[in-house]
């Protein structure tokens, strides 16, 4: 029945890989299963028979489907179905899309869809890496034109050694999470988060990963030779070369004048009448020109701008390694916890940081081992930031990707929960965009976090590097690309980091790959630019982290109780902890390990709650002073509750410094008084003294 069923086996990073084709999904253009250890993914690729009408781009979509059954979970949603793609799945889709997209024919407009379905997950073997391999195989053996194959790999840095596809245990103490995708001779995608890794070590890690990628690419190429289908002929949508030559000859000077300004608004205004004039001049000769004028204008501008850049001219007059004018500001909003605005040319980003209790950490319901994250970064890109009108539909893949990059850049410098027991949310609002908004988000977030009093280990800045290549193989790179240079260039090499090293990388390319020399040049230029931004702008706006959090932020205190005392702190049905929360106006979170987090706007009340919790969680100490509540009066003394469930007796002789005839003369039920623990007998009964507590407090005041 399955006469086309084939299997192929190899090893990758020392672990077995098995590829199966010809058994399932027979109607897709290309399909395969990849088993990487016990991680199993299925990839299917399909293409439309005809090109899509009215588009000037290649319509590729990539979906990475996380199935909860792959990790033995039932979805937590009301419907118990997988819902919209998680952020992690979207990021995985982007990590497949970016390497494969530049390898499709530039003039093809047929819809192509790649669907990667995660069927089984072994934590040691990444489904994202297996998914990239599966997608590459599915496209390679299909009849869809493509200049692959490619593969990807994860590189870690564990205990001073570079590691390929680190295991779950190794990832727990890993200083580098680098994903590299490559072809047989070039690097086509880089995505990284790192603990301040030096440039030279990062380049070494890329080369280390690429060496193993070459083996997988050779394996996929061999599969393609054995079972690959002939590639179909497609209708080329390439623009008429003669038409483009005529337009550039007649309107080249006007286009150059329109483009030669550092003001995006002025440039756009200048281009509108030129576009209308081109249509009016050539529409009789080329009847379809009104339908393709957008693509014509794109290609004409691209030709001019690329030639300028290669020869060292930038539209805003900057040098190749010159950064746009910069500005940084903090405390821009009065009642938020903290805020910062970072401006680079016509790109402006405002980041607001909000601090909350640790329980506000984001809960993650996915196939990953991670269940929550305490530091969250979200990026918003409204249409007004580029002067357009468009309805707000919530964050798209681009916004999620940019937010994740800024988050990765800051995570290595965020203090541990023990050092700073808060959940932290940064929101970057793009106010104006002319390129490199994600890097502006990194800078704005650093300003905001420092303003918030978050003791980050080092300030982080972000910068991008662009690329122009020629057909003869020559190339040049430029730092701090603006929108036009990103749009018409070949690369957006985004790097975030401190003065000590790199914390995040994201590389998008439009060519068939990067050489090591190009990557080294990008590292060198971004490193210098990062240091300049930090020294000359950001650290002048806020030289060091605020010593305290904002008065509007909750005050957070921590303590730890023995695990066997957690039940007492919580109380039956939560009565004890609810009572403490209500009386002290605080929020209390208790972890399974006994760590307790108390948050509230009033520091004194938070300290009171901590004192009560410590009293419950730890046996009363002889000689310690507590504040308790009088619960009962007897002829011989008063019973005082120093913590929920812990009561002691203040004998009438120890109620006051003077002789007391009646207990009621000194205290009544409900009074709060200070008491000192004098004795705990064999039966656990606590003897207290108000007289000694008052004497100790008075002696301490006199000593001060």
What are these regions (language model features)?
Residues 1-235:
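Long, basic N-terminal domains or extensions that often function
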Residues 1-48, 235-369, 554-568, 576, ...:
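Extended amphipathic alpha-helical scaffolds
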Residues 28-112, 118-125, 184, 191, ...:
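Glycine-rich, flexible beta-strand/loop modules in the N-terminal catalytic cores of phosphate-handling
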Residues 30-32, 125-143, 330-353, 434-454, ...:
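Conserved phosphate/anionic-ligand binding catalytic regions in large, soluble enzymes, centered on
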Residues 36, 45-47, 64-66, 116-120, ...:
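Flexible glycine-/small-residue-rich
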Residues 106-112, 147-149, 216-234, 265-266, ...:
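Flexible, glycine/charged-enriched surface loops at secondary-structure junctions
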Residues 143-259, 449-547:
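Mobile "lid/hinge" segments at catalytic clefts and subdomain interfaces of large enzymes
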Residues 552-558, 563-704:
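Single-stranded RNA-binding regions, centering on S1/OB-family and related RNA-binding modules
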């Amino acid at each position: 029945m399955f006469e086309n069923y084939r299997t192929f086996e190899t090893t990758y990073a020392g672990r077995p890989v098995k590829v199966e084709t010809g058994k399932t999904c027979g109607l897709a253009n290309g399909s395969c299963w990849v088993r990487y250890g016990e991680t199993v993914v299925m990839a299917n690729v399909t293409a439309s028979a005809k090109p899509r009408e009215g588009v000037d781009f290649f319509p590729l979509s990539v979906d990475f489907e996380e199935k909860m059954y792959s990790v033995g979970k039932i979805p937590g949603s009301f419907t118990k179905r997988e819902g919209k793609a998680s952020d992690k799945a979207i990021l995985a889709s982007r990590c497949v899309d970016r390497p494969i997209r530049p390898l499709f024919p530039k003039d093809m407009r047929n819809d192509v869809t790649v669907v990667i379905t995660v069927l089984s997950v072994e934590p040691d073997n990444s489904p994202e890496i297996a998914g990239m391999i599966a997608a590459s195989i599915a496209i390679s053996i299909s009849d869809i034109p493509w200049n692959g194959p490619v593969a990807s790999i994860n590189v870690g840095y564990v205990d001073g050694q570079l590691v390929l596809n680190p295991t779950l245990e190794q990832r727990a103490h890993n200083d580098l999470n680098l994903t590299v995708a490559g072809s047989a001779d070039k690097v086509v995608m880089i995505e990284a988060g790192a603990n301040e890794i030096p440039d030279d070590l990062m380049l070494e890690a890329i080369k280390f990963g690429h060496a193993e990628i070459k083996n997988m690419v050779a394996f996929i190429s061999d599969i393609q030779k054995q079972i690959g289908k002939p590639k179909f002929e497609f209708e080329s949508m390439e623009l008429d070369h003669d038409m483009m030559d005529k337009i550039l000859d007649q309107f080249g000077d006007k286009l150059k004048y329109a483009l030669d300004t550092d003001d995006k608004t002025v440039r756009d205004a200048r281009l509108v009448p030129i576009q209308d004039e081109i249509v009016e001049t050539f529409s009789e000769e080329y009847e379809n020109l009104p339908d393709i004028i957008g693509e014509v204008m794109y290609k004409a501008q691209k030709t001019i701008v690329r030639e300028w850049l290669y020869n060292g001219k930038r539209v805003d007059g900057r040098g190749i390694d010159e950064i746009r004018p910069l500005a940084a500001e903090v405390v821009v909003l009065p009642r938020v916890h903290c805020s910062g605005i970072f401006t680079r040319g016509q790109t402006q980003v405002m980041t607001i940081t909000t601090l909350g209790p640790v329980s506000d950490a984001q809960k993650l319901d996915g196939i990953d081992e991670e269940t929550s994250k305490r530091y969250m970064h979200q990026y918003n890109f409204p249409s007004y930031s580029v002067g357009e009108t468009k309805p707000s539909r919530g964050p798209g893949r681009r916004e999620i990707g940019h937010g994740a990059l800024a988050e990765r850049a800051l995570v290595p410098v965020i203090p541990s929960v023990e050092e700073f027991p808060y959940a932290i949310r940064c929101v970057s609002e793009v106010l104006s965009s002319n390129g490199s908004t994600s890097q502006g988000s990194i800078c704005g977030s650093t300003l905001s976090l420092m303003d918030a009093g978050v003791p980050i280990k080092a300030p982080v800045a972000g910068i991008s590097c662009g690329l122009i290549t020629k057909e003869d193989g020559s190339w040049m790179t430029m730092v701090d690309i603006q929108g036009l240079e990103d749009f018409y260039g070949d690369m957006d090499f985004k790097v975030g980091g401190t003065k000590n090293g790199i914390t995040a990388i994201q590389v998008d390319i439009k060519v068939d790959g990067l050489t090591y020399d190009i990557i080294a040049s990008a590292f060198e230029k971004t490193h210098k630019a990062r240091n300049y931004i930090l020294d000359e702008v950001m650290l002048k706006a806020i030289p060091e982290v605020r010593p305290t959090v904002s008065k509007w932020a909750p005050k957070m205190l921590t303590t730890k109780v023995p695990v066997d005392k957690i039940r007492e702190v919580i109380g039956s049905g939560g009565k004890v902890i609810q009572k403490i929360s209500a009386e002290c106006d605080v929020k209390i979170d208790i972890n399974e390990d006994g760590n307790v987090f108390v948050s509230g706007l009033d520091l004194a009340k938070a300290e009171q709650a901590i004192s009560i919790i410590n009293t419950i969680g730890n046996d009363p100490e002889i000689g310690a002073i507590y504040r308790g509540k009088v619960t009962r009066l007897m002829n011989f003394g008063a019973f005082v509750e120093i913590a929920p469930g812990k009561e002691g007796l203040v004998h009438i002789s120890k109620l006051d410094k003077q002789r007391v005839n009646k207990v009621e003369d000194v205290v009544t039920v409900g009074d709060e008084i200070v008491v000192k623990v004098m004795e705990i007998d064999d039966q656990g009964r606590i003897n207290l003294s108000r007289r000694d507590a008052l004497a100790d407090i008075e002696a301490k005041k006199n000593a001060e």
